[in-house]
């Protein structure tokens, strides 16, 4: 400006803030600075002039090496930001340009002084300029890049101090609203990589660092609210700056990383999570360190946003190519660590996560089969995914969750030809305490569509960052109905894992029961072509029986006036019993088939008691007639004599079990004596005495049958069996015994029509004796053909209520639901990974012949 021409007032006010002299540690004149702040506070429009003037003066001072004046300019900017932060966008570009000039100067003292201005700028900037000012975005990202590069200075003079400057800036930007925008989030990855690199280089113990910061930021309990949060941050900052420079590097890195996750911005949490995963994949990070890191950062996030971390991990895993096994293993390990932890993830869509992992596992198995890649890495990845899904059972957020998870996996195991008619989800009490569920395929289809859109809109850079593709497998929530043996075996093991895991829970009554109807459509697996699938299916169903009927606190006996529950006896268990009959009477039945069939039969009777007897007896009686005909030489079937002997052995053991559950001690003794005799004669395969579980050696099953002694074997005719029941099983109502010995084809006609309807059922509960007597027991809201058969449906319930006078015990049963008691012990402590490591099935079971 020419001499003699007066300067504008805003320039004079700014210049008056500069003290005289050439000192390196100048500070603004306090009174003049106060007047400048008063001036701009009352005339905010002047900020548009003060900002550029201060920027230009600072640029000249930097170029001329006037360190003291630069510090004054930085202090003035700091005060302007504090006092006029509502209008920060008016001079935000000037602040960023000034900081760029300062950090590019290479002066350590000036760069350290710039940290305060940058921290205030990040604290008060609302991110608005990131939405419509590309020049500002470019400058700001350039500034961030310079700060990040400061922290990467190689070892040398003042390298630790330079690193602290960069880490201080990283901590500041981590808490900024600017980084939480879609545009600003692109800068998260390099900053997070810097922080993790710093932590890994120092070989930091993450849990110890977290604990130390918490102690350093501790406050008295009488301080609360936003004041407490602000004081907590100040206390942590003071704690960090009191440490040695080397410790400051570790604490600053850790605190900055914590700040990235201590936010309500979904975009920021998601971007930071992906950055962590990318770093772990591309760096040689120990697995324990990586898994600990993921669990710790999840605890930092607000509880209602923690699920974003898990969803981000699953999305990255789904997007990876099946060829990228190493990276998939890393992400799967992180998912498993998070699901195995005690981190509470409110709002987590468990079913979508389960569906995504099921699809991914099926895709990996299919890829391995098609490319003949049965490597240990693939097996490890498949096992890890199974462990992830089982661990989902430790995060229970609603009463029907276990039921829904089991139903979802079992639905994927049903025959694809009939899967459209099999559904699950909406619950209705069937009077057993187990719930009948109405099909909800449309609900899951809707969820699939919604999540397909979510998956499509996810960041496409994930695949590139992790060396994968976006179409690695089915998207989140979509269905995969692959019924190959390997897939079926894995899925059945997952369901078994759910039950084993839940058996260790102390308060299982907090979870609703898994309905028997969830198994509808899976009974064909008992006669699957693969012996391993059959084995896995039996293990799985036995685990279900132990879970639902193995805890005395969970269920109580209540069979009603007919001595059994029709929904159990004439429902899925009856259909399963048909398949059991087919399994043991098949001409190609092996020792493994007999072992599995006998184990399944024994568990059904032990757990379901009278209901199990009613459901299985017609089918076992039919099998007994075949076995007796084979033993006596009166059969035209092509089964062998040894098979007939084993069928008879199974039936005799079955009668012994019926005696046990029916309090018919004489029947138990008589059947037990026959068992002892057959063992003595060599007419008893030793494997019928084996307990069967997923750790059994099924392939060791062998039958040393001495067929020459068959003449000494005692067999019972149909009438003799009926006589035994009439004489000994007196606890069973006469009309029920009559049903058991009805013509087999007539019984099957009723059983085959007994299907779960699509309509809702009125819950079979009552709150008073009057209500119970009025007929609230298991009435249907609507009726349709095929429920019980045209000739039965109209009078079935009327017949049951005829002459029925409810008692207090009946009311208790109606209020609580009928159920069962077992004296079997609950499973010991269960670990999903250990279970999967020891869970083995054999591939030569089908080769064992009699």
From Swiss-Prot:
<protein>
    <recommendedName>
        <fullName>Protein EFR3</fullName>
    </recommendedName>
</protein>
<dbReference type="InterPro" id="IPR039786">
    <property type="entry name" value="EFR3"/>
</dbReference>
<dbReference type="InterPro" id="IPR049150">
    <property type="entry name" value="EFR3_HEAT-like_rpt"/>
</dbReference>
<dbReference type="GO" id="GO:0005886">
    <property type="term" value="C:plasma membrane"/>
</dbReference>
<dbReference type="Pfam" id="PF21072">
    <property type="entry name" value="EFR3"/>
</dbReference>
<dbReference type="InterPro" id="IPR016024">
    <property type="entry name" value="ARM-type_fold"/>
</dbReference>
<dbReference type="GO" id="GO:0072659">
    <property type="term" value="P:protein localization to plasma membrane"/>
</dbReference>
<comment type="similarity">
    <text>Belongs to the EFR3 family.</text>
</comment>
